[in-house]
Amino acid sequence: MLKTILAFDTSMSVCSISLLHKNRKYNIQKECRNNHTLYLLPMIHEILKKNHVSLNEINIIATSKGPGSFSGVRIALAVAQGISLGLNLPHVISLSTILIMAEQVWNNHKISKVLAIITVNKTSVYWIQYSRNFHGLWIKKSKAIILNLSKALEKILSLKKQWALVGNGWDKFPKNILKKIFITNITFPNSKYIISLISANSIYQKKEVLHKIIPIYLNER
């Protein structure tokens, strides 16, 4: 049986908090925009209180490490550090936001090829592709790169087979171009899929010392 896990994500505009306790999952989400610091700790308190779980019962802290906004990723890692130090848990689990969204695609649609296109600014997007193997592991099928819109469009047109699209960058391209892609409308990570990944495979249970986690930012502020 898995231990009690507190998982959260603030890498994009939504604050997402999840709890696994006695094999039951709980989840709350809220649109936070750039106010993650105002919402994250109260939401953690809320999910624990509603489910009658004390902070001291938490065995594992898990969060996303990006790619995401500079402030959002930093806030999540800072809160993870604060809670883990308070509970004397020197290690945390950190997962890519793309893996979290890919796992949601698999859970909801059973599509094993996932393309992430995330807006960086008005003229460029973050691009990466993952494929799920028979063991439930997500394997990179491309490098993570920043592309201008014309180059990204070229890559979309060259895609073979069906890919599920996640991220908020799809609206930068003509809808008729995207017909060969399954648009999932998954534009941000839901932290309950952090717990799904951890539960599914020991590969995703790897814990790290916080200062060794390398965050991935989509911008510099």
From Swiss-Prot:
GO biological process: tRNA threonylcarbamoyladenosine modification
Principal subcellular localization: cytoplasm
UniProt KW keywords: Cytoplasm, tRNA processing
Annotated compartments: Cytoplasm
A GO-annotated cellular component: cytosol
Disulfide feature: none
Similarity-based family: Belongs to the KAE1 / TsaD family. TsaB subfamily.
Function: Required for the formation of a threonylcarbamoyl group on adenosine at position 37 (t(6)A37) in tRNAs that read codons beginning with adenine. Is involved in the transfer of the threonylcarbamoyl moiety of threonylcarbamoyl-AMP (TC-AMP) to the N6 group of A37, together with TsaD and TsaE; this reaction does not require ATP in vitro. TsaB seems to play an indirect role in the t(6)A biosynthesis pathway, possibly in regulating the core enzymatic function of TsaD.
Protein name listed in UniProt: tRNA threonylcarbamoyladenosine biosynthesis protein TsaB
Natural source organism: Buchnera aphidicola subsp. Baizongia pistaciae (strain Bp)
